[in-house]
């Protein structure tokens, strides 16, 4: 029985990156032998055991065989005769198909170390094509290691997988799981570049793929191309280390520009409402969680208004707060301001240009929150007990006055 550290832990150690999780493969052992040594069995599809002290996962070496489309169509085989190389060859990329033994010796049968040095993602074998999730994994790794490129033969294989319909067999939850993980990496735009290059983005997110080649007014968008702009916005959100819902909102905020009739280009009048509708559709299809969906829909609908915030009247601002449910969910509204600021900065030459609208709207919201709705409601019930409709009107007017005072102070300080 021999135990090896495998996969990402070996890769990251060679790269000088902090190792977070270690995966172990056990060669030459049976489940009965593992249990006899006090390992706890936890695997459903194949034998995985928890170490009795560290509780880290140890998997018996295994092979796998494709039996149906998609990422679930596999039969696994494991016994004491499966070799380390047989286990490693089923892995996705050469850089993830290395192992380290107890003496610290690196076992690298597929040239992973060479590809690490050359910063190349290359598939281990033709078995890569059996699991469409691997396309998403390669794209996600590109977002984590943006200096790496995908080998030409690997990209060609991914293109063939897309053409064969393998990507269409992915379940929505798994697609979103991988996209979300990629969005949280250091340079999410690399993930989408890889997905576009192999044609997978058009199958998974046609609404997003449609943005490349769609022009915007150069006066406001020196980068011109909408797809390029959206990638800059998402990368800015990553640079600011913002939460997943904000990155998701950054990704989807301009989907409506992809359906603007070409004769209207480069203008996109009314794209905000179109964007909001498309975001709803995408989130429903991919089963995207509610926090990401709600913020993305709101950002798509309102980012134009936030951009014009300094021109809005107090009454319009309060109506916007009410429409966004900002009094019950103020943090979500602030997150939307953050996403809108990413939209502003995600343009060529605008990365360091101030965006006073964020602080301006937060100040306005804070002023509106000082209004005591309960007191106003009690007073109105005393004066007009038979006219309950006047209560929300009175609260609205009080908030408008508070906001007007606050924004007037901002515009005319001192």
From Swiss-Prot:
Family: Belongs to the tRNA nucleotidyltransferase/poly(A) polymerase family. Bacterial CCA-adding enzyme type 1 subfamily.
Example of a GO MF term: tRNA binding
Catalytic activity from the UniProt record: a tRNA precursor + 2 CTP + ATP = a tRNA with a 3' CCA end + 3 diphosphate; a tRNA with a 3' CCA end + 2 CTP + ATP = a tRNA with a 3' CCACCA end + 3 diphosphate
SUPFAM superfamilies referenced in this protein's UniProt entry, alphabetically: Nucleotidyltransferase, Poly A polymerase C-terminal region-like
Note: A single active site specifically recognizes both ATP and CTP and is responsible for their addition.
A Pfam short name: PolyA_pol
Cytoplasm found in the keyword field: no
Matches recorded under InterPro entries: CCA_bact (IPR012006), HD/PDEase_dom (IPR003607), HD_domain (IPR006674), NT_sf (IPR043519), PolA_pol_head_dom (IPR002646), PolyA_RNA-bd (IPR032828), tRNA_CCA-adding_enzyme (IPR050124)
PROSITE patterns: HD
Signal peptide: none
Organism (species): Herminiimonas arsenicoxydans
Domain notes: Comprises two domains: an N-terminal domain containing the nucleotidyltransferase activity and a C-terminal HD domain associated with both phosphodiesterase and phosphatase activities.
Protein name: Multifunctional CCA protein
Biological role stated in the UniProt entry: Catalyzes the addition and repair of the essential 3'-terminal CCA sequence in tRNAs without using a nucleic acid template. Adds these three nucleotides in the order of C, C, and A to the tRNA nucleotide-73, using CTP and ATP as substrates and producing inorganic pyrophosphate. tRNA 3'-terminal CCA addition is required both for tRNA processing and repair. Also involved in tRNA surveillance by mediating tandem CCA addition to generate a CCACCA at the 3' terminus of unstable tRNAs. While stable tRNAs receive only 3'-terminal CCA, unstable tRNAs are marked with CCACCA and rapidly degraded.
Keywords for the protein's UniProt record, in alphabetical order: ATP-binding, Hydrolase, Magnesium, Metal-binding, Multifunctional enzyme, Nickel, Nucleotide-binding, Nucleotidyltransferase, RNA repair, RNA-binding, Transferase, tRNA processing
The gene coding this protein: cca
Oligomer and partners: Monomer. Can also form homodimers and oligomers.
Classification via NCBIfam families: PRK10885.1 (NF008137)
Stretches assigned to the HD domain: 226-327
Cofactor note: Magnesium is required for nucleotidyltransferase activity. Nickel for phosphatase activity.
Entry's EC annotation: 2.7.7.72, 3.1.3.-, 3.1.4.-
């Amino acid at each position: 029985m021999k135990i090896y550290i495998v996969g990402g832990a070996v890769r990251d150690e060679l790269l000088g990156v902090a190792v977070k999780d270690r995966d172990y493969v056990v060669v030459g052992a049976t489940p009965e032998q593992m249990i006899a040594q006090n390992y706890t069995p936890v695997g459903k599809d194949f034998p995985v055991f928890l170490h009795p002290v560290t509780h880290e996962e140890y998997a018996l070496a295994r092979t796998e065989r494709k039996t149906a489309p998609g990422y679930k169509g596999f039969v696994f085989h494991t016994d004491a005769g499966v070799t380390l190389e047989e286990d490693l060859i089923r892995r996705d990329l050469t850089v993830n198909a290395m192992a380290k033994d107890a003496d610290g010796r690196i076992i690298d049968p597929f040239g992973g170390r060479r590809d690490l040095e050359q910063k190349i993602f290359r598939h281990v074998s033709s078995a890569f094509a059996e699991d469409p999730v691997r396309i998403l994994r390669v794209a996600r790794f590109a977002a984590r290691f943006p200096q790496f490129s995908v080998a030409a033969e690997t990209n060609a294989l991914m293109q063939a997988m897309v053409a064969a319909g393998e990507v269409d067999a992915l379940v929505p939850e798994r697609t979103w799981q991988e996209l979300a993980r990629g969005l949280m990496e250091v340079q999410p735009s690399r993930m989408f570049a890889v997905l576009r290059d192999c044609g997978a983005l058009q199958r998974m997110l046609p609404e997003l793929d449609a943005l490349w080649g769609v022009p915007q007014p150069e006066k406001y968008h020196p980068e011109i191309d909408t797809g390029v702009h959206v990638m800059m916005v998402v990368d800015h959100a990553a640079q600011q280390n913002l939460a997943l819902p904000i990155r998701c909102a950054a990704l989807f905020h301009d989907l409506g520009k992809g359906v603007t009739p070409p004769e209207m280009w480069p203008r996109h009048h009314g794209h905000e409402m179109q964007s909001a509708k498309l975001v709803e559709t995408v989130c429903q299809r991919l089963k995207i969680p509610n926090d990401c969906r709600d913020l993305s829909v709101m950002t798509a609908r309102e980012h134009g208004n936030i951009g014009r915030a300094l021109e809005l009247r107090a009454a319009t601002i309060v109506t916007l707060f009410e429409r966004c449910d900002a009094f019950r969910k103020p943090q979500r509204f602030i997150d939307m301001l953050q996403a809108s600021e990413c939209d502003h900065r995600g343009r060529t030459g605008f990365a360091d240009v101030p965006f006073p609208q964020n602080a301006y709207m937060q100040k306005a919201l804070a002023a509106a929150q000082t209004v005591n709705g309960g007191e106003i409601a009690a007073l109105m019930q005393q004066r007009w007990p038979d006219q309950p409709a006047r209560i929300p009107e009175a609260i609205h007017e009080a908030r408008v006055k508070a906001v007007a005072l606050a924004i007037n102070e901002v515009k005319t300080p001192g």
